[in-house]
Design a protein with these regions (language model features):
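Intrinsically disordered, low-complexity, mixed-charge
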Residues: 1-92
């Protein structure tokens, strides 16, 4: 399968609404590796690596967000696949 790596920035009401935790659950369900963290400007940043179809599922989920979030914008940057991760972490 084709592998993909993306870095995403999610803007909106995405902090304090369990967005990172929900993304981690989805990532684990789909076998995606990487990390997610809050940024000081109120956005959430994540790096996702895995099968292209599964990464795309998570990117689409980020447009909808967790139950209490309100996503305004999702910026997606394609990056070179590195296979550097062994799990999916919430960074603090």
């Amino acid at each position: 399968m084709t592998k993909q790596r993306v870095r995403i920035f999610v803007k909106g009401k995405v902090q304090g609404v369990f967005f990172r935790q929900a993304l981690k659950v989805k990532a684990i369900q789909h076998g995606i590796l990487g990390w997610v963290k809050n940024l000081n400007d109120g956005r959430v940043e994540a790096v996702l690596e895995g099968d292209i179809e599964k990464v795309n599922i998570l990117v689409e989920w980020c447009h909808a967000g967790s139950a209490n979030s309100r996503v305004e914008d999702v910026e997606i940057r394609n990056e070179k696949f590195t296979n550097e991760f062994s799990n999916f972490d919430v960074l603090y």
